[in-house]
């Protein structure tokens, strides 16, 4: 854990954008872009010599291109050997940064789950309280009906319906 804190606190090892990475690599190994530029220039000169029908100059530029490519390859290998330990440290740092991001993402996901669980429990408690209150009210309503006679209940439930009103109208009864 102390190693991780040391690496994360080191200002040399910080997250960087692709442009920053390009600039850093350009500063670390300036010979590689120089070799690439020399190769491109030799190819350009060979092309121009071919257009001018100067085969001697064209062959000389193709040889120069081969030398420039060899120089570039040598710069890549030498730079790789020279910066081997730093690249290894950077890879370890990037791995730790990814682990930290994954852990933060996991923690955020767990916090979200806990919040949803708390919300669900609150909803269930409110729902249970409402159902208990509803049960108490229905029990209170049942207690009121227990003291009444059953015939009164039937009379109350039976009212004048549409059919009764039509029959009464046909028979000529007035209410």
Curated annotation (Swiss-Prot):
This is Respiratory supercomplex factor 1-B, mitochondrial. Keywords: Coiled coil, Membrane, Mitochondrion, Transmembrane, Transmembrane helix. Gene3D superfamilies: 6.10.140.1320. Associates with the respiratory chain complex III/complex IV supercomplex. The gene is rcf1-B. GO terms for biological process: mitochondrial respirasome assembly. Its main location: mitochondrion. It holds the Pfam family HIG_1_N. Cytochrome c oxidase subunit which plays a role in assembly of respiratory supercomplexes. GO terms for cellular component: mitochondrial membrane. Residues 3-94 form the HIG1 domain. Residues 83-115 form a coiled coil. It comes from Talaromyces marneffei (strain ATCC 18224 / CBS 334.59 / QM 7333) (Penicillium marneffei). It is found in: Mitochondrion membrane.
